[in-house]
Amino acid sequence: MAVIKMKPTSPGRRGVVKISRDHLYKGEPFAPLLEPQFQHAGRNNNGHITTRHKGGGHKHHYRVVDFLRTKDGIPAKVERIEYDPNRSAHIALVCYADGERRYIIAPRGLEVGASIMSGAEAPIRVGNTLPIRNIPVGSIVHCIELQIGKGAQIVRSAGTSATLLAREGIYAQVRMRSGEVRKIHIECRATLGQVANEEHSLRRLGKAGAKRWKGIRPTVRGVVMNPVDHPHGGGEGKTGEGRHPVDPWGNLTKGYRTRNNKRTQVMIVSRRKK
């Protein structure tokens, strides 16, 4: 994939960097695998904002992606690679030998016409999904399950991958892109290869309006708010925080670790690098 730098014909185009999509399918998505997606603008069922900076954006359907990959032993052929507005990764439409079609996360190097398979007996090839116990140590994997049969939960974004370091008993050690080493049950599944669209991090939207197209609203600094709205607010003229930086609810930010999940703490062998 090529990186396209736009000509500075206007201030809004000057800093735009796009990723070429020439290799992607140009037609409509596969209709039976589409679902309506309703806009909630970050509100919950009470109308309260639970996720800030969300609202607006272009309407689009949700593509139902198969994260379980449970059609074991049935080969599938890649029909096309598509753009998905709901995620940074590209998706591939595959057709199984029994005629069923499903979307999967497209790994790097997967091409139209390639054959993929899932299950314990699947060959060691990019795009195939196997239990971790059947994957060679040192392999690059993505779309990893954290609980047996729950479906892929981590390493699903564009360009991401994890490395299978070792197997000890019923657990395997996997190193994430962040540097964290985590224990995962060997019966959990993972897909071989790296997620495609690795140039996604190089793109630049170039203007505020492009963020609004994505449904992202402005992020306002706390120091320019009133005291009722943020702990950093208030003061006469330009003033600083006057305290250690905190979020709108008073929790320390800028480096303070807030993780509090003792249930899965024992599964982390080495914390992620800062």
UniProtKB/Swiss-Prot annotation:
Residues 229-246 have a biased composition (Basic and acidic residues). GO terms for biological process: cytoplasmic translation. Keywords: Ribonucleoprotein, Ribosomal protein, RNA-binding, rRNA-binding. One of its GO terms (cellular component) is large ribosomal subunit. This is Large ribosomal subunit protein uL2. Belongs to the universal ribosomal protein uL2 family. Gene3D superfamilies: 2.30.30.30, Nucleic acid-binding proteins (2.40.50.140), Ribosomal protein L2, domain 3 (4.10.950.10). Residues 223-256 are annotated as: Disordered. Part of the 50S ribosomal subunit. Forms a bridge to the 30S subunit in the 70S ribosome. One of its GO terms (molecular function) is structural constituent of ribosome. One of the primary rRNA binding proteins. Required for association of the 30S and 50S subunits to form the 70S ribosome, for tRNA binding and peptide bond formation. It has been suggested to have peptidyltransferase activity; this is somewhat controversial. Makes several contacts with the 16S rRNA in the 70S ribosome.
